[in-house]
C-alpha cells in the first residue's frame, strides 16, 4: 500500500489511485502561475494533489478536479475534505470529453495521464490512466479551448518531445503560448518535461507572432541535492524545506 504524501498544509492519501504523487507533478503545481483565474479546472486530477496545490497558491480561486477513474476521484474527495481548502475544492467522476461546467472556467491545469505511442500497461488501472488511444494532444487542446473563456489560462505538463506538437495544437485552437519551462532532473541531463502556459485568444484578436518566453528549471544539482531554484520553488509545499 502506498504511503500518504504529506505536504505543509495538506496530506494526499493515495492507496487507491491509479498513479501516485510524483516530484514532477509537485514541481508542475509549484510552477503554476495563474494571473487571473478564479475558476480552475484540474483535468485528470488523480490524487487531487494539483487541485490542492492550486487551492493553496490561489486563495481566491475555486478548484474542481475531474477524472475518469472512480477510485481516484473518491480518494481525492477524501483528501479535499481533510484539507484546509474543503470549501473551495471539489472532485467529479466524469470523462472530460463529456463534461459541461456549471460555471465559466478561466483556468485549466492538466498533467495529461497518458503517453501517446507508448504500449499499454498490463495493469488495467495504469492502462486507463496512462494510455488513452482516442485522446490526443489535439483533442485535449480542442476541449480546453471549448471549456475556457476568452483570455482564460491553460497550463500543461508534457514530455519535452511533445513541444512541436503542442505548439501546433495550441496555434490551431487560438491559444497564444506565453512561457515554456523546460524541466531537467540534473544539469547534465536533457529536459524530459515541459510546462506550457498559454492564453486563449479572441478569434478576432489572434496572432501567431506572439513571442514565447523559455525558462529552464533544474531539480537536482550535480551532488544530488535540490538546487536553490528547486528549494525556492517548493518551500511552500515540501515539509523538509
What are these regions (language model features)?
Residues 17, 21, 135-187, 191:
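Conserved Class I SAM-dependent methyltransferase catalytic core
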Residues 112-139:
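Mobile active-site "lid"/loop adjacent to the S-adenosyl-L-methionine
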Residues 2-39, 45-47, 52-57, 209-219:
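SAM-dependent Rossmann-like transferase core, predominantly class I methyltransferases
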Residues 13, 90-92, 178-181:
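General small-molecule cofactor/ligand-binding pocket signal
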Residues 28, 111, 140, 198:
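Residue-level signal for inorganic ion chemistry
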Amino acid at each position: 500500500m502506498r504511503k500518504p504524501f504529506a505536504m505543509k498544509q495538506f496530506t494526499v492519501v493515495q492507496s487507491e489511485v491509479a498513479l501516485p504523487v510524483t516530484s514532477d507533478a509537485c514541481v508542475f503545481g509549484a510552477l503554476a502561475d495563474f494571473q487571473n483565474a478564479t475558476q480552475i479546472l484540474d483535468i485528470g486530477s488523480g490524487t487531487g494533489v494539483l487541485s490542492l496545490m492550486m487551492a493553496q497558491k490561489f486563495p481566491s480561486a475555486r478548484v474542481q478536479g475531474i477524472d475518469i477513474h472512480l477510485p481516484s476521484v473518491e480518494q481525492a474527495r477524501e483528501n479535499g475534505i481533510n484539507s484546509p481548502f474543503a470549501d473551495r475544492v471539489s472532485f467529479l467522476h466524469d470523462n472530460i470529453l463529456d463534461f459541461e461546467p456549471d460555471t465559466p472556467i478561466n483556468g485549466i491545469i492538466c498533467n495529461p495521464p497518458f503517453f501517446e505511442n507508448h504500449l499499454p500497461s498490463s495493469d488495467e488501472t495504469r492502462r486507463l490512466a496512462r494510455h488513452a488511444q482516442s485522446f490526443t494532444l489535439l483533442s485535449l487542446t480542442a476541449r480546453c479551448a471549448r471549456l475556457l473563456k476568452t483570455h482564460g489560462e491553460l497550463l500543461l505538463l508534457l514530455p519535452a518531445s511533445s513541444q512541436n506538437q503542442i505548439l501546433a495544437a495550441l496555434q490551431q485552437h487560438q491559444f497564444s503560448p506565453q512561457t515554456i519551462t523546460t524541466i531537467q532532473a540534473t544539469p547534465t541531463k536533457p529536459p524530459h518535461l515541459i510546462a506550457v502556459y498559454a492564453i486563449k485568444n479572441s478569434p478576432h484578436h489572434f496572432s501567431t507572432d506572439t513571442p514565447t518566453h523559455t525558462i529552464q528549471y533544474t531539480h537536482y544539482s550535480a551532488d544530488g541535492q535540490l538546487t536553490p531554484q528547486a528549494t525556492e520553488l517548493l518551500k511552500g509545499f515540501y515539509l523538509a524545506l
